[in-house]
């Protein structure tokens, strides 16, 4: 049952995005996308840790909010840095080829925008978690 459900979910995602999420992840550059994923996982870890500490130690729970914010901001910064490095490498390829074909430019821009998009997603998740935790803590 799990396999069938997972397969249907992946087909739905594939139909919406045109590619699987893993393919988009690799297309955005494995290094920066992996670093941003680590930031997302850290944000989730600190969010869960803060939720578990709310009842026992509210002060520690409030201090953890800074870690959630920092990991989300780092994910966003890494995404922007990945975009700039991707654009620089795309411009190097254009310079070496001598021809600015629209398909090459469009492909380079698409790849360059994937890492900041994932970084923005990480940042948004962390800010949403902080907002919810602040509401719960009051």
What spans do the regions from the language model cover?
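Hydrophobic alpha-helical transmembrane segments of small proteolipidic membrane proteins, enriched
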Residues: 11-138
């Amino acid at each position: 049952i799990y396999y069938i459900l997972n397969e249907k979910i992946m087909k739905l995602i594939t139909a919406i995005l045109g590619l699987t999420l893993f393919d988009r992840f690799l297309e955005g550059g494995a290094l920066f996308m992996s670093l941003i994923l680590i930031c997302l996982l850290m944000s989730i870890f600190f969010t869960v840790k803060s939720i578990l500490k709310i009842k026992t130690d509210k002060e520690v729970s409030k201090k953890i909010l800074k870690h959630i914010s920092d990991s989300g901001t780092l994910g966003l910064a890494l995404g922007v840095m990945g975009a700039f490095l991707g654009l620089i490498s795309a411009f190097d390829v254009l310079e070496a080829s001598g021809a600015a074909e629209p398909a090459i430019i469009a492909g380079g821009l698409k790849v360059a925008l994937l890492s900041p998009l994932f970084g923005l997603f990480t940042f948004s998740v962390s800010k949403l978690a902080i907002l919810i935790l602040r509401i719960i803590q009051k």
